[in-house]
Structures are given as C-alpha cells and as structure tokens.
Amino acid sequence: MLDTGELRERFQQHYGIHPHVIVRAPGRVNLIGEHTDYNDGFVFPVAIDRATCVAARPRTDRIVRVMAADLHDEDLFSIDQIERSNRAWHNYIRGVVLALRTAGHTLSGADMLIASDVPRGAGLSSSAALEVAVAYTFQVLNRLNILGEELALLAQGAENTFVGVQCGIMDQLIAVFGRADHALLIDCRDLTYRAVPLPPSVAVVVCDSHIARTLAASAYNQRRQECDAAVRALQQWYPGIRALRDVSEDQLAAHQHELPEPLRARARHVVSENRRALQGAAALEAGDIATFGRLMNESHASLRDDYQVSLPDIDFLVTTAQSLAGCYGSRLTGAGFGGCTVSLVERSSVETFRHDLAQAYHDATGRTATIYVCRASDGVGRVMDNARPQE
C-alpha cells in the first residue's frame, strides 16, 4: 500500500508547498472474461489494493507539471499545446488532459506528483489506473461534474487515440466503479454492472511472472483486428450482428468451416468466454466456487489454444497452480504475452500455495515470481483533501 503521508511530503519537497488533494485509482485483476471487452462482451474483474496515487495542486496558468516519483522523471506541457512525447508515460497524462479539453471542460494547470505500486507491464492495468487517477484529479481541481461512466470513457479514449492502444473499456470502468470485497460483472456494451460478493473463504492470488510485455508493441491490436474481421465474415450469414458478443456458440459452430483461421479460433474464444463470464458470476453468487474454478481453467485453455496469447512459462505457472492443494482454478489474466496469472485459492492453503508455486517456477525457469494476495478494493477517490486524510 502506498503511504499517502509520504507522498504528501515528497510533493512538499519537490514543489515547496503541500498538495491540495491526493487521489487514488486502483489496478485490477480480471477473474474471467478475457479479450471480451472490446467485443462488447462481459468481464468479471476486481479492483485491487495496488494503486496509482496523484498528489496535486491547481495552478493559475495553463501549465501542467508532473513528477513521476517512481521513475525520477518529469514532464511539463501547456494545456493549449499538447503534443505526443517520446516518453511513453508522458502520453497517458497528456492524452487524458487533451481528452478533457476536447470534451469541452475548462481546465487550469496543475502541479502533480505521481506514485504507483501497480507493477508496470504485468497485466494489472497500470495504464488505466494512471489515466483514471489523472482524470479524476483534474475533475477535483477544476470542480468538474463528470459522471463515472464519462470519466472511464474519457480515459479509454485517451489510450485509444493518443497512446495508440486499442484497449477496451474494462480497465477504466473497474478503476472507477470498483467495490471493496466484490467483483463486478460488467456489460461492456451498455456499461452496466453488477457487484458480486467474493466468498470470504477464498483468496485471489496473483502471480507476476516478471515476463514483461509492452501492450502497444504486442499482438493486442492484431487480435482486435482479427475479431473485427470475424464479425464482418459472419455478417454474411447474420447481418444483424454488431460484435462477437451477438454471436451464439451454435451460430458459430454452424459456419465454423467457412470461417478461415485464425478468425475461427479467435471468434471461438470470445464467444465461449462470454458464456464463461456469465456462468462464472452466477456460480460465485451461488457459492459454487468449484464451478468457478473449472471455468477459470477452461478460460486459460481457450486463451492458450484459440486466442494464442499465452507463453510456455505462463502455461507452466497455470498448470502448476492448478495441481496444488487448495487451488480451485488458475488462468492467465490481462492481455497476455507475459504478465500475471490469477488463481482462486482456499485461504487456509494460501501460504503453502505461494511457496510451492514460487519454488516450482524458479526451479523450471530460473526466474523469481512475485506472488501476493489481492484484496478487492474501492474505485477511484480522494484519500487526502486539502492536505488532510479522508475520514
């Protein structure tokens, strides 16, 4: 957990004055429903207790100054002249400010200091946490009236258009609407959601493989293009469909031999994953943890074989986790090509599970995994207001 008191003091040291506000936006781990959000589908994430915090004060001019405490790097730009930077982290912030300006919001400049304990490049949505935290900070400093849904869409738009990653809406929505001790079943078409309590007897265990992947440079955008191509191909038989979310498994099976690879496999994953997300949420609501775990295992097999976003070392982590006592299910989480796995584990077995998984991974690969239990947390909000902690 980030120490907001320390963040306040670091802001004071850097800018010579205390911050007006400190905002926190969480990372996320998706329990099931992977690569479905940009297909108008269903996802089932939790906001986690790792977050990005922004300490900030308003300025009287139109200049934005940003210090990234973790990177020991700075950015400075004018709200009136926002251009792309050759520093990747700059563009997430600049893109959000540009999105707010383009939406017609009146903005003043700001001095900001940013810190995060969401691992970068691990698939826990460090980028969305940053985008949402920055957007919410500007909302607070400028007394804007932006609904949570609009805030998430602005943040997503910044990543799509300014950063150049065609992400879906899940990461930004869970960063905004996350609820402590709950997962959210989100409909990524109409942006409605339902909070589902997490059973207290199980723990959400995340394993960071330390196989880093840069989302913008990966095959993520290619997968999205393949899904769009699959929709266009299926529209010759089903002209009413707008996205793979509209296709049933029976409809896909009826024309699977007429759909070329890899489009057939990509569509098969998305269509079946939507079913698994809905069934998984219903299973947890009913207290059927075993069924949820089985669906997690099926999800990973689909990501590995049909969506082809896993790697051999990730598969090793997943199959090892699935074999350990107390583990109900395990899968790749996030965009893939490295990053993290998520497992649902009986609380009484967590410490043995962590030790055995870390040991097996190190023995097999020589790498040291970081394994931690995630607590489902609330979405974006203020943790300090006018330099005072929130009650």
UniProtKB/Swiss-Prot annotation:
Its EC number is 2.7.1.6. ATP binds at residues 121-127. It is found in: Cytoplasm. The active site is at 171 (proton acceptor). One of its GO terms (biological process) is galactose metabolic process. Its main location: cytoplasm. Pathway: Carbohydrate metabolism; galactose metabolism. One of its GO terms (cellular component) is cytosol. InterPro entries: Galactokinase (IPR000705), Galactokinase_bac (IPR022963), Galactokinase_CS (IPR019741), GalKase_N (IPR019539), GHMP_kinase_C_dom (IPR013750), GHMP_kinase_C_sf (IPR036554), GHMP_kinase_N_dom (IPR006204), GHMP_knse_ATP-bd_CS (IPR006203). Keywords: ATP-binding, Carbohydrate metabolism, Cytoplasm, Galactose metabolism, Kinase, Magnesium, Metal-binding, Nucleotide-binding, Transferase. Pfam families: GalKase_gal_bdg, GHMP_kinases_C, GHMP_kinases_N. GO terms for molecular function: ATP binding; galactokinase activity; magnesium ion binding. The record marks 28 as: Transition state stabilizer. NCBIfam families: gal_kin, PRK05322.1. Belongs to the GHMP kinase family. GalK subfamily. PANTHER family: GALACTOKINASE-RELATED, MEVALONATE KINASE/GALACTOKINASE. This is Galactokinase. The lineage of its organism: Bacteria, Bacillati, Chloroflexota, Chloroflexia, Chloroflexales.
